[in-house]
Amino acid sequence: MRRWPVLLAALVMLAIGSAALSRPHQPVDGADPSTSLNARTPVPAPVMSSLRQACFDCHSDETRWPWYAALPVASHLIEGDVTAGRGQLNLSRWTQYNPFDRADLLDKICERASTGKMPPWQYRMLHSEARLSAPDIRALCDWSEREAARLVQGGS
């Protein structure tokens, strides 16, 4: 019977200790603006706005960390999601992809936005501004299809 209070106290101390060790997220060092999506790729303002609202937090080096990202468990979950997102697509390093990879990524952006896979439902639940409307998705797909075609035809 006396084990439960001791176990609970140990868990509380562990939580407090891990909170103290949790570091605030810092901007990415060495981020080069000349490699970002809009550095050499013409992106209409409404499309860029949609990308910033729905994609950039996980798919760029310009992550806006929410307040709850400083909480111990949430910090690790969110950091894992952002790391995975940047690994799949990093809009801050857009020019580092070859033109065919960029065209493929543009196709995936349209497909995932159209099917509701991106942004993920848990992100949309916490970030209402990330919910893309049907016209937003159509504009995003129209642009991505045009840009992908341009890249495949020899654009850079």
What are these regions (language model features)?
Residues 1-4:
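Positively charged n-region of N-terminal signal peptides that target proteins for export
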Residues 6-22:
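Hydrophobic membrane-insertion alpha-helices, especially the h-region
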Residues 19-32:
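Aromatic-capped interface at the extracytoplasmic side
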Residues 29-51:
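Electrostatic cytochrome c docking/interface patches
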Residues 76-126:
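Extracytoplasmic electron-transfer domains, predominantly the class I c-type cytochrome c fold
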Residues 115-117, 122-155:
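C-terminal capping alpha-helices of c-type cytochrome domains
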